[in-house]
From Swiss-Prot:
A Pfam family this chain is assigned to: XPG_I
Protein function: Structure-specific nuclease with 5'-flap endonuclease and 5'-3' exonuclease activities involved in DNA replication and repair. During DNA replication, cleaves the 5'-overhanging flap structure that is generated by displacement synthesis when DNA polymerase encounters the 5'-end of a downstream Okazaki fragment. It enters the flap from the 5'-end and then tracks to cleave the flap base, leaving a nick for ligation. Also involved in the long patch base excision repair (LP-BER) pathway, by cleaving within the apurinic/apyrimidinic (AP) site-terminated flap.
Annotated organism of origin: Trichoplax adhaerens (Trichoplax reptans)
Protein known as: Flap endonuclease 1
N-terminal signal peptide: none
Subunit annotation: Interacts with PCNA. Three molecules of FEN1 bind to one PCNA trimer with each molecule binding to one PCNA monomer. PCNA stimulates the nuclease activity without altering cleavage specificity.
Gene: FEN1
């Protein structure tokens, strides 16, 4: 789920924190990708006649097809992906996981009703909501990525928090996920829509945490409290508090503690035994692997093993897989060129000189003529 309404809130209150880009603009960038989120997307999106793709043995292959081809697309555009997999969910997430299971069961009932009525649109709609990612899907995804030469990181807990840790450690440029709580975990740069199919023509949204904090005029702790008020995976929020009011309350009272002390109990319902402090600590000090000594390596794909796994075991086309392997090898050759900005450090002095030069150029253009009028050029 992530954080309810955070993307729109940032667009409304801190628009300078968002920009849109084409995938080619990330050439040479290393990106930590929320693997579980991506695999779940592929299970929902990569389908045939409304059903997940399967091989002759009836095994699901949507996740493998999506992972293989979308990863190749990123690599062809010069991106170096690192896939981060979820570990054990935190105790605070148990309520959210139970709600998700209830929603899946309800969707299953609605899908069955749609089948009885022959309603194709609703069959597809509700069937997608019943999709569940299994440990087997994740293990197969890891195997595929390693054979492709793409680094895999196993998070001890939440993948988004591990991605954020990699960004903070300078190991990667950004976190690639659809879950906005990557920002709440402290990822300074977050990319949405990175693993979407090219056919959807969705620009990549790039969020900058630092800009959001500056424009909102919030500290990181206040931003986390805002996210808890909006609604997160780890606890309920105060009933009656929407995004606009949440911003106003943080601006006025600065913390959830003071909000709870001052708001009207007649207007707003604060959850009993509300574990917002535990949720706050989870965002501030998540369970992650230390990244400082972590070595991320992109290696040559193992063509023979990929053919064995995807063709012999999973029923993919050998010609397509071998062409994919060729694309990976070619992409590795071009991505090693790196980005131009990785060779230089832009200092504040350099920025100031550039600004001063622009001012001087502006003065020259605006030089008045003898009669006090501006010269035409």
């Amino acid at each position: 789920m992530g954080i309810h309404g955070l993307a729109k809130l940032i667009a409304d209150h801190a628009p300078s924190a968002i920009k849109e880009n084409e995938i080619k603009n990330y050439f040479g960038r290393k990106v930590a990708i929320d693997a579980s989120m991506s695999i779940y997307q592929f299970l929902i999106a990569v389908r045939s006649d409304g059903n997940v793709l399967t091989n002759e043995a009836g095994e699901t292959t949507s996740h493998l097809m999506g992972l293989f081809y979308r990863t190749i697309r990123m690599m062809e555009n010069g991106i170096k992906p690192v896939y981060v997999f979820d570990g054990k969910p935190p105790r605070l997430k148990s309520g959210e996981l139970a709600r998700r299971q209830e929603r899946r069961e309800e969707a299953q009932k609605q899908a069955s009703e749609a089948e009885k009525e022959g309603d194709a649109d609703n069959i597809d709609k509700f069937t997608r909501r019943t999709v569940r990612m299994t440990p087997e899907h994740c293990e197969e995804g890891k195997k595929l990525l390693k054979l492709m030469g793409v680094p895999v990181v196993q998070a001890p807990c939440e993948a988004e928090s591990q991605c954020a840790a990699l960004v903070k450690a300078g190991k990667v440029y950004a976190t690639g996920t659809e879950d906005m709580d990557a920002l709440t975990f402290g990822s300074n740069v977050m990319l949405r829509h990175l693993t979407f199919s090219e056919a959807r023509k969705m620009p990549i949204q790039e969020f900058h945490l630092k800009n959001a904090l500056q424009e909102l005029n919030f500290s990181m702790e206040q931003f986390i409290d805002l996210c808890i008020l909006l609604g997160c995976d780890y606890c309920d929020s105060i009933k009656g508090v929407g995004p606009k009011r949440a911003v106003g309350l943080i601006e006025k009272y600065k913390s959830i503690e003071d909000i709870v002390k001052n708001i009207s109990s007649e207007k707003f319902t604060v959850p009993e035994n509300w574990p917002y402090k535990d949720a706050r600590m989870l965002f501030l000090n998540p369970d992650v692997e230390k990244c400082e000594d972590m070595e991320l390596k992109w290696t040559e794909p193992d063509a023979d093993e990929l053919v064995k796994f995807l063709v012999e075991e999973k029923g993919f086309s050998e010609d397509r897989i071998r062409r994919g392997v060729e694309k990976i090898s070619k992409a590795r050759g071009t991505s090693t060129q790196g980005r131009l900005d990785s060779f230089f450090t832009i200092t504040p002095g350099a920025i100031k000189r550039k600004t001063d030069a622009k001012k001087d150029a502006g003065k020259k253009k605006a030089k008045p003529g003898p009669a006090g009028r501006f010269k035409r050029r």
